[in-house]
Curated annotation (Swiss-Prot):
Pfam short name (any one): HRG
InterPro entries recorded: HRG
Name by which UniProt lists this protein: Heme transporter hrg-6
A single GO cellular-component term on record: plasma membrane
UniProt similarity note: Belongs to the HRG family.
GO MF annotation: an example: heme transmembrane transporter activity
Keywords: Membrane, Transmembrane, Transmembrane helix, Transport
Residues in coiled coil: none
Membrane topology: Multi-pass membrane protein
Source organism (scientific name): Caenorhabditis elegans
Gene that this polypeptide is encoded by: hrg-6
Record's keyword annotation contains Transport: yes
UniProt main location, coarse: membrane
Induction section of the entry: Constitutively expressed. Not regulated by heme level.
């Protein structure tokens, strides 16, 4: 049995859909209940990268991901890696701002601008972007390998018993 990145592709798709739903739910909370626009922006950006992950997994399930161009994987890898590093910087900045402004995490403290929520969504963004970078790198290498060394036809004389 071959080891996979996590588990069956349907489980990965379901996990990603849950992440998208949670992101959209919290976006509604930030809009209608807490009016935290900075956390909303970070939340929606992280959710957009979750949609990218969903598209990756859907392409894997449909077996169309290796039809993509090699440059597509390189561009996606670098964009996701750079945004991941930026989200680390955003998370550290948000934590420092939350600590220096003595913000809390209670329901009452969440109304208006709260940097703890923003830091959390920068962490979520880091998860999705680096996961996407890993997937893009993996399938980019797989595509390059399949172009350079196409699969040989199965020759019974080479079988080992």
């Amino acid at each position: 049995m071959r080891w996979s990145l996590c588990c069956h592709i349907n489980v990965r798709i379901a996990y990603t859909i849950c992440g998208i739903i949670i992101g959209l739910f919290w976006a509604c909370v930030y809009i209608f209940a807490w009016k935290n626009w900075v956390a909303l922006a970070a939340c929606l950006t992280a959710t957009a990268f979750a949609f990218e992950t969903f598209y990756f997994y859907l392409s894997v399930k449909r077996d169309t991901i290796l039809n993509w161009k090699s440059q597509t994987f390189q561009v996606l890898f670098w964009i996701n890696l750079i945004v991941g590093f930026l989200s680390i910087g955003g998370m550290i900045t948000a934590i420092v701002l939350a600590a220096t402004k003595h913000q809390g995490v209670s329901n009452k403290d969440q109304h208006g601008l709260n940097w703890w929520s923003t830091a959390t969504w920068f962490l979520v963004m880091l998860k999705w972007t680096w996961q996407n970078a890993f997937i893009a790198r993996y399938y980019g290498k797989l595509l390059t390998k399949s172009i350079i060394h196409p699969e040989e036809p199965d020759d019974p004389s080479t079988w080992k018993f």
